[in-house]
Each structure stands twice: as structure tokens, then as C-alpha cells.
């Protein structure tokens, strides 16, 4: 009887082990089927995206780094990945490397505050806009340009903006007799140029400016959008989209499906949150 009882116990244990092993294999198989969405951004362009040292507020790890990324673009990337059933991976690249990374397939898409310009559309596809950003100028409160009511009042000023942007390529040349200095490599660099008074003003978009005046209280936003003396830009210049490889129309369509569920009010609420939690706002 003891032998029979022992045999039964062994069989039960073996059965349990086999069941557990089968369950683990199923779990591993399920996990292995989860695709990764590789999203590139600068991680240095608040409030769209920035780098921080921890995962506070929902920040996500940056690939091949001990740091984390957060901001409006990360919030949007997390939402898109969740809705499409992807695991999100944020890849940190400099601005000029973003489009080439999509073209080469080293990343799946770019969510980095990119305007949907005709030049970029020749290289990559874009989703529908995930934000609409008006273009403004920033100056110092003690600048002689602080009382400007339109771009004609900025005539003769020394200025700059970020490299490879509509702000630098399209907007600054519209200012009469402007002394346009070489473009800056990043948004933080152009803010430093203004703060150090190497330039009288810079051109950027409203979210970047709203974030900047928190970090630099001595700066002032010059918003001419409600006047007839504003920068002449097209809708493509203020529409911000997700860039995707032309070889991957399925992903573009899928992301558009997610964006279609959101409203302009949703976009603005997310941006307000991003501005409120950016590191320099604390």
C-alpha cells in the first residue's frame, strides 16, 4: 500500500510540474509575440520631450541608457503603443538624425514635435496632426524689442532659432534687415543664446516658449498670431505629426486610427500637463 501511495504522489507531482511548465511556456510565447514600437525623439526639447533620471510621472527608459524620457511626445507615444498593443522603446537621437533613422528602418517612427512640411513629406510619411503649434518669438523683458506688436517691430534685430526648423528657415527671413546668426543645434541651445543676450530674440513655437518662461522668468513671449503683422506660414508649418517610413503605410494608418479618437482639447490638456511637470517647472 505504501508503494502504491508513493507512486500516486509521484504521479501527482509530475503532473503538476508538467502543467506549470506548460503554463510558463505559454506565458513566454505570449510575451514573445508582443511587438516593440521604436520611437525616436531628441529627449531634450521640453515640453515635447526631455531626459530625466527617474521614472517619475510615468517616464519611460531611454534605450541603451540609464536615463528616462518624458514629455508630451512620450505621453503620446505611450498612448499609441498601448492602443496598438506594442511595447514602447524610446530611442534618443539628435534632431538631424531623426528622419534618416526612419528612412533606414532603425526606428519605426519619430514623435518629436516635427512640423509636417512638404520637404519632409518627400522623405517620410506623416500621420494626421497630434498637435497644432502656433509660431511666436521670445525676447528678454529688458530688451528694446519687448514691446513689439508685430514682426515689423523686430526689424534690425539679432536673432536665431533651431537648426532644420521652419522657425529658422521660413520665419526669421521674413523680418526686415534681421541679423540672423547661425542656427542652433537644439532648443536648449537657442534658449541659452537668448538668455546670454547673444541675440535679441528667437523664433519658436508656443509650447516651447511656455516651457521656456518657466525656466527663464526674465523672458517674454511675443505673440503676433492675432494680428496682421505676423509670420506668413502655411498650415503644414504649424501641424505637428508622427513621421513614419514610406515603406510602412500600415503603421501610419494604425497611428491615425488612434489619433482619430482624440480631440484638440485632449491635445491641449496633455500639453498643459507636460508643461506643468517638466523638470525646470519645479
Predicted regions and their residues:
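Periplasmic-binding protein-like
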Residues: 132-139, 214-259, 277-282
Amino acid at each position: 500500500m505504501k508503494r502504491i501511495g508513493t507512486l500516486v504522489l509521484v504521479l501527482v507531482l509530475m503532473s503538476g510540474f508538467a502543467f506549470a511548465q506548460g503554463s510558463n511556456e505559454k506565458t513566454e510565447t505570449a510575451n514573445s509575440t508582443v511587438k516593440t514600437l521604436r520611437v525616436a525623439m531628441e529627449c531634450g526639447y521640453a515640453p515635447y520631450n526631455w531626459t530625466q533620471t527617474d521614472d517619475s510621472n510615468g517616464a519611460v527608459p531611454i534605450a541603451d541608457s540609464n536615463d528616462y524620457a518624458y514629455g508630451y511626445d512620450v505621453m503620446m507615444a505611450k498612448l499609441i503603443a498601448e492602443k496598438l498593443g506594442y511595447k514602447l522603446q524610446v530611442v534618443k537621437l539628435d534632431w538631424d538624425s531623426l528622419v534618416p533613422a526612419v528612412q533606414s528602418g532603425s526606428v519605426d517612427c519619430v514623435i518629436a514635435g516635427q512640423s509636417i512640411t512638404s520637404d519632409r513629406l518627400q522623405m517620410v510619411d506623416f500621420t494626421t496632426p497630434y498637435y497644432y503649434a502656433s509660431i511666436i518669438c521670445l525676447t528678454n523683458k529688458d530688451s528694446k524689442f519687448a514691446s513689439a506688436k508685430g514682426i515689423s517691430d523686430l526689424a534690425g534685430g539679432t536673432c536665431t532659432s533651431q537648426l532644420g526648423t521652419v522657425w529658422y528657415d521660413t520665419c526669421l527671413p521674413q523680418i526686415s534687415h534681421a541679423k540672423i546668426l547661425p542656427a542652433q543645434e537644439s532648443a536648449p541651445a537657442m534658449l541659452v543664446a537668448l538668455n546670454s543676450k547673444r541675440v535679441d530674440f528667437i523664433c519658436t513655437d508656443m509650447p516651447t516658449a511656455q516651457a521656456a518662461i518657466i525656466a527663464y522668468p526674465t523672458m517674454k513671449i511675443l505673440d503676433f498670431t492675432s494680428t496682421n503683422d505676423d509670420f506668413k506660414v502655411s498650415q503644414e508649418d504649424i501641424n505637428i505629426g508622427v513621421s513614419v517610413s514610406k515603406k510602412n503605410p500600415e503603421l501610419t494608418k494604425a497611428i491615425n486610427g488612434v489619433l482619430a479618437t482624440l480631440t484638440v482639447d485632449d491635445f491641449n490638456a496633455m500639453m498643459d500637463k507636460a508643461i506643468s511637470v517638466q523638470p525646470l517647472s519645479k
